[in-house]
Amino acid sequence: MSQIFSFAGENDFYRRGAIYPNPKDASLLLSLGSFADVYFPPSKRSRVVAPTIFSAFEKKPVSIDVLPDECLFEIFRRLSGPQERSACAFVSKQWLTLVSSIRQKEIDVPSKITEDGDDCEGCLSRSLDGKKATDVRLAAIAVGTAGRGGLGKLSIRGSNSAKVSDLGLRSIGRSCPSLGSLSLWNVSTITDNGLLEIAEGCAQLEKLELNRCSTITDKGLVAIAKSCPNLTELTLEACSRIGDEGLLAIARSCSKLKSVSIKNCPLVRDQGIASLLSNTTCSLAKLKLQMLNVTDVSLAVVGHYGLSITDLVLAGLSHVSEKGFWVMGNGVGLQKLNSLTITACQGVTDMGLESVGKGCPNMKKAIISKSPLLSDNGLVSFAKASLSLESLQLEECHRVTQFGFFGSLLNCGEKLKAFSLVNCLSIRDLTTGLPASSHCSALRSLSIRNCPGFGDANLAAIGKLCPQLEDIDLCGLKGITESGFLHLIQSSLVKINFSGCSNLTDRVISAITARNGWTLEVLNIDGCSNITDASLVSIAANCQILSDLDISKCAISDSGIQALASSDKLKLQILSVAGCSMVTDKSLPAIVGLGSTLLGLNLQQCRSISNSTVDFLVERLYKCDILS
């Protein structure tokens, strides 16, 4: 054996003979023949040089992988149906890319073979958010939905790290001819080329939404306009490279357009709005113009050509003056207008708003917010002119006082059903009474939210003026006392929201429940710290159909919860006791008793309720959504 290992240098080899003294043991490690050459470097461990031995274990390439992509493409497009193509697509990314790149017109299927799924064409919808939005997923969706009715609705919400590009939209465009709705949010990696693919392959597209798509220009929108004549809804927001040219193409080619919303697109000017309105006079029903660089000209066009508009939203139009609203109202084109929303437009003055009221005789709903130049005179004039008005909401109109509020109530006619005041800081308490014959019998809903000057005298006047109220919302009115609330006790109240009214007492709740026990369905007294268990006892005794009760941050305890559970009449579906520190684990049996009808339970910030109790309720009340 010593001769075997007595090598002088790198060129020494041992030929012929077994490496190990026992060939049977050696065969367990290496199948070396008696003629294998072995080289032993002097300073390294021995290694075997036998390339021909291990070649038998190498993975041989599959024969079909030898084919170039062109040949595979020809094979895939001749498969008999979408299921077969889908099965092939999920073999590898290479095959998926090839299958998803096949246009519908390139599919070569014998005429005797028909594909199923025509009855529910375009019935599927898919949504990709954030990191899930990738080209591979889009390709898989395109191929996978082809054999199951076809993709009808696609929404892509990207992120800064999104890996979706034109390649993904190419897959959709070539494989989903039934696509009817496409929504793209925050996808800066998609360009006009992606929309060109959609335009070429998805001629049935009806709804298009582009939000923060900074790389899409007029070119992409023009392509959509030319190839998708059935487009009915268009939404553009924060698309910095889309302007008048794209809107002009849409107006000329999409005669069925019914809804347009454009927000924060700096290149959209009067010319684009004018072309849009003048070419869709008979079809356009909903129009939203927000934060645009348009002037009085656009509003004049709206007033003249908006013959079919029923819903109009104007927001943040800083370059529109009083003249614009005056001309819009006098254009007599908005005869069908049903709903009007105006927000943060400096041109809303008394004269402008009165003109709009006169020019829209069929308007039923109006929302006016953030209009610092609107005063009592303008509001009352608008109310007189709007003979069909059923709902009026004012928000952050700080020049409107209590005189404008009551004046509009008295002059809105017999159709006004809902009135809302939100954050109007000039509202104060009445110091003079209203005429004895005054009434507003049609009003059913009144909402006064966060108007700190609104007090008891106003509520007393409302109690006399509006005897048929059903829905009362007095959120955040800390200046109202017990006597003020008692003026509003009607016999038909259905929904009550007194959240944040710190002066609300048990006496008021007892009086309300005793008078409205057979009609009250919703009661919200969140944050009314003077409410105790006595109110819950009254609720349990009087309320027959109450379904939603919010007693968060009230001074209630376990006794109050037990009182609710003891009522045979009460069938609560929603109960909130968030922030009630005196409600403890002792209320567990009572809550379980209420749980037979509960669908929602809020136990957040109930520090005296242990986690084990919450876990038990989650397990026991399996039909109820529990927040803790």
UniProtKB/Swiss-Prot annotation:
Protein name, UniProt field: EIN3-binding F-box protein 1
Presence of the UniProt keyword Nucleus in the record: yes
Pathway named in the protein's UniProt entry: Protein modification; protein ubiquitination
Tissue: Ubiquitous.
Native source species: Arabidopsis thaliana (Mouse-ear cress)
CC per GO annotation: cytoplasm; nucleus
UniProt-listed GO biological process terms: ethylene-activated signaling pathway; negative regulation of ethylene-activated signaling pathway; protein ubiquitination; response to ethylene; ubiquitin-dependent protein catabolic process
Record note on quaternary structure: Part of a SCF (SKP1-cullin-F-box) protein ligase complex. Interacts with CUL1, SKP1A/ASK1, SKP1B/ASK2, ASK11, ASK12, ASK13, ASK18, EIN3, and EIL1.
Subcellular location: Nucleus
CDD domains tied to this protein: F-box_AtTIR1-like
Upper taxonomic lineage: Eukaryota, Viridiplantae, Streptophyta, Embryophyta, Tracheophyta
